[in-house]
Regions:
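General beta-strand structural signal in soluble alpha/beta enzymes
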Residues: 89, 159-165, 209-211
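Active-site-lining helix/loop region of Rossmann-like oxidoreductase modules
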Residues: 170-171, 179-248
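Short, glycine-/small-residue-rich phosphate/pyrophosphate-handling segment
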Residues: 138, 142-166, 173
Length: 248
């Protein structure tokens, strides 16, 4: 698979290297390509450095990994290239950055403060179903929107999916490929995006776990109850249910 990686920070650069090690053809963007020379040389042609528009055009799947402050600019210069493609969003809105307010209440960053979501009857009813469906039902009543939903508004022609945004790179490196596999929460409303993200997650040595649609990404982003949680895949169902219950 050809994978374009937009952003060669700690996470983006690491994912680019792992994808190349897993046999994918990878193009990564960087403002300082000389810093990637060692990784490029080591990958024997599987990893190359391109401009942001070039990497977006190169990838059959694109990993979107800029800093949140540069996310809008990155979308603006790649929107046409992303049309119809699966884009894996690994960003987190900056803590305290306004995302949007909805009728249920205000939201700051990924913090969920809508009053209706704290209704214990709603919480109890929601967690009785499959956790991923429960997340979608509960969060449809809350105010605000996830960073993923914001990206969807900016580039609606892309097939967006959230993954790789809950755990820091050092933990990913420590847990990669080791049993019990680390769960990687996946949030999307697009079937092809879910399938592509799950394939890459497995290729990189983790276990995909579907947490719900784009609204459910709020659970995994900055301030959400799944952010910074190191969860084994065998415990992922319970962790998602606990995350929903924590919103009371």
């Amino acid at each position: 698979m050809r994978i374009g990686v937009i952003g060669a920070g700690q996470l983006g650069g690491t994912l680019a290297t792992w994808c190349a090690e897993s046999g994918h053809d990878v193009a990564v963007t960087s403002r300082h390509p000389e810093r990637l020379r060692e990784q490029v040389d080591r990958m024997n042609g599987k990893l190359r450095v391109m401009s942001v528009p070039q990497a977006a055009a190169f990838g059959e799947v694109v990993i979107f990994a800029p800093n949140w402050s540069g996310a809008k600019e990155a979308v603006d210069v790649t929107r046409s290239a992303l049309e119809g493609k699966v884009v894996i969003d690994v960003t987190n809105p900056a803590d305290g950055a306004p995302v949007a307010a909805g009728p249920g209440g205000a939201a700051t960053g990924s913090h969920l403060t809508g009053a209706s979501i704290k209704d214990p009857i709603l919480v109890a009813a929601a967690i009785n179903g499959p956790p991923s469906e429960a997340a979608d039902r509960m969060l449809s009543h809350a105010g605000g929107k996830s960073g993923l939903e914001t990206l969807i508004e900016w580039a609606p022609g892309a097939h967006w999916v959230k993954a790789f945004n809950t755990i820091p790179t050092d933990v990913l490196s420590r847990r990669r490929g080791h049993d019990p596999l680390l769960a990687e929460f996946v949030c999307t409303d697009e079937r092809d995006a879910r399938e592509a993200a799950c394939r890459i997650i497995r290729d990189l040595g983790f276990a995909p776990f579907y947490a719900g649609g784009a609204k459910a990404a709020r659970l995994t982003e900055t301030g959400g109850p799944l952010q910074s949680r190191e969860v084994d895949v065998r415990d992922a169902t319970d962790a998602l249910a606990e995350a929903l219950a924590a919103l009371r």
